[in-house]
Amino acid sequence: MSYNIGIDARKIADFGIGTYIRNLVQALGELDQENQYVLFVGLQNKEILEQLPGNFRVVIERSPSYSARELVFLSWRLFRLRLDLYHSTHYVLPAVVPCKAIVTIHDIIHLLYPEFLPSPLAFFYAQRMIRRSLSRGDRIIADSQNTKTDLMEYFDVDGRKIRVVYPGVAESFRHRVTQEEMNRTLAEFGLERPYLLFVGNPKPHKNLDNVIKAFARALEIHPFEADLVCVGDRSSIEFKIRQRASQLGLSDRLKLLGHVEDKDLPTLYQGATLFLFPTLYEGFGLPVVEAMASRVPVVTSNTSALKEVAEGYAHLVNPLDVEEIAKAIAQCMADEDHRDALIKLGVRRAEDFRWSRTAEQTLDVYNSALRRDSRKGKRQTDPKDKA
């Protein structure tokens, strides 16, 4: 039986959620030719979803994410389109959802670290919307067991409604680039020396200040010839970053590349000597497994989902302890055998994360929600709900 399924893809251009949406949609397109899909996108993002299969179509939705408009206008669209199921790829559901509802909740950092939010209003909005989605959603998808546990503990909800579906790693990170491609890309970005890589947005929980301080301290512990390269839009905090680098004598060692196109990311990963990601909190930590798939040793945090994903496969540190991060960097840079061991472990771990598997499990969640007795209004038993 074919169903009409709507997916909120308005955040498709975003750094984190956008990666999730782009790869999930592509993998669903390769997996499922039976159901009909409607993708809600903003006007400026419709070109991102070119070359979709025939059972996918795009609907322009001008309501901004996290706005009052989306609560009303998306509800109206869902009524008009007569969908069987709607998948919200972030934590907000429209005011009324006249069909089955799936909600992906990537993390609850808004609630665990309210000091990072711009205002108390943002905290109360996130809290209310997540609580509402947990109540009204037929199924909840969490990026990790850590996020599922956070949801259960913070909101005191029944975990049987929440299904853990890990994101995947794009195959482009596993594909080895040629030396010619490597040389060309590094030259385009002006990278002339070996480098350590950090990938992330400018939000405080990414812990970039501690990364810079730890990099400087590592150079004191074990001097090495390498730069610190940071990928991600950080225009809002660039002055503070450069000021910190100047204070530490790193002005010529810090390279801020800003936003980088998806096509260039695998090359930048594969060119790195070491990947640094000691963030304070992650719902999954996709850059970690991207680095692992790229055959780069990883230093990351022993907290949140990062421990779940990387323990035993990366060098874990306390993200609040600059000295510990610095010693990890120094050890990795001094000990080639240690780096090689981390590379082998990381490649093995990255095999656990494929977008084809994410799509299969997401489609299984869809079918679980749709599998109901139409006469009694009760769902059939889904064995995965007991997990």
Language-model features, listed with the residues they occupy:
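Carbohydrate transferase catalytic cores enriched for Leloir-type hexosyltransferases
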Residues: 1-387
